Amino acid sequence: MSPTTCTLRKHKTNRKPRTPFTTSQLLALERKFRQKQYLSIAERAEFSSSLNLTETQVKIWFQNRRAKAKRLQEAELEKLKMAAKPMLPSGFSLPFPINSPLQAASIYSASYPFHRPVLPIPPVGLYATPVGYGMYHLS
C-alpha cells in the first residue's frame, strides 16, 4: 500500500524518514543533555553541525529526551510514594492524606516527643484475665 492511500497513518508524503542516530551521536547527545537540558539557538546550530545532524533533528531529540526524563522522574516519584505508604488492609485509610515520603516522615517524627499514643496496659495480677480471653470465651 502506498503512503498516499494509507488510511491508518495520515502524514505528509514528503516526510523525511526516521533518523537512525549513530552510537557516537547518541553518546554526544546524552552527554550534552546531562550538561544542559535546553540549548539556545546558537548552541543548537553549533552542536548539530558538529554531529552532522540538522538543527531540527537535535531540537526534536532534546524535546523527546526531556519528555523521557520527565516520565522517568514521575515513575521514580510514584515508586517512592508506594514505598512510603504504610501497608494497611484494604478499606483502611488514614485520617489525613500522605502526599510525599517526606511529609509522611515529618508527620510521625514531629509529634513524637509530645503526642505519643498511649496504649492501654492490661491488668497484671493473680486474678487478671489473660488478654484475648473474656468470660464469653470460656467453655
Swiss-Prot record:
Listed InterPro entries: HD, HD_metazoa, Homeobox_CS, Homeodomain-like_sf, HTH_motif, Msh_Homeobox_Regulators
Record localization: Nucleus
UniProt cross-references to Pfam families, sorted A to Z: Homeodomain
GO molecular function: DNA binding; DNA-binding transcription factor activity, RNA polymerase II-specific; DNA-binding transcription repressor activity, RNA polymerase II-specific; RNA polymerase II cis-regulatory region sequence-specific DNA binding; RNA polymerase II transcription regulatory region sequence-specific DNA binding; sequence-specific DNA binding; sequence-specific double-stranded DNA binding; transcription cis-regulatory region binding
Keywords: Developmental protein, DNA-binding, Homeobox, Nucleus, Osteogenesis, Repressor, Transcription, Transcription regulation
Any single GO CC term annotated in Swiss-Prot or TrEMBL for this entry: nucleus
Keyword Nucleus among UniProt keywords: yes
Bias (Basic residues): 8-18
SUPFAM superfamilies membership: Homeodomain-like (SSF46689)
Region Disordered, annotated ranges: 1-20
DNA-binding feature ranges: 14-73
GO biological process, one term: odontogenesis
Quaternary structure note: Interacts with MINT, with XRCC6 (Ku70) and XRCC5 (Ku80).
The protein's role, per its UniProt record: Acts as a transcriptional regulator in bone development. Represses the ALPL promoter activity and antagonizes the stimulatory effect of DLX5 on ALPL expression during osteoblast differentiation. Probable morphogenetic role. May play a role in limb-pattern formation. In osteoblasts, suppresses transcription driven by the osteocalcin FGF response element (OCFRE). Binds to the homeodomain-response element of the ALPL promoter.
Family: Belongs to the Msh homeobox family.
Name of this chain's protein: Homeobox protein MSX-2
Species in which this protein is naturally found: Rattus norvegicus (Rat)
